Amino acid sequence: MAVGTHRSEFAGALRAWRGRRRVSQLELALAAGTTQRHVSFIESDRSVPGREMVVRLAEALDAPLRERNSLLLAAGYAPAYEESDGTPTSGSTQ
């Protein structure tokens, strides 16, 4: 899968999760420790989020661990959580 496809997939997934949680870009940005502009750029594919930013956004959205893995995969990163118990996978920087 091309990198651009990952970006589009993540941008759509992030918008969908933000909509489910009914939070604004500003509210999400404040909770994730970034700016509203950065969230806007990520959602419109004008910025590529790093792995840590993807994790922070997923945590700020209180996404279930399985969905956090899905968001990481959508952004082109390896999953961070084991399927069995939600603990970080070995080698994770968490």
Region annotations inferred by a language model:
Residues 1-21:
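A short, Lys/Arg-rich alpha-helix, primarily the initiator
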Residues 3, 30-31, 49-55, 59-94:
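Short amphipathic recognition helices of helix-turn-helix/homeodomain-type DNA-binding modules
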Residues 10, 35-38, 53, 67:
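Short N-terminal amphipathic alpha-helix/helix-capping patch enriched in small hydrophobics
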Residues 12, 22-23, 49-52:
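Residue-level signal for the short linker/turn that defines the boundary of a DNA-recognition helix
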Residues 15, 26, 55:
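Residues within the helices of the helix-turn-helix
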Residues 22-41:
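Short alpha-helical DNA-recognition segment
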Residues 44:
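Short, conserved catalytic or interaction motifs in soluble domains
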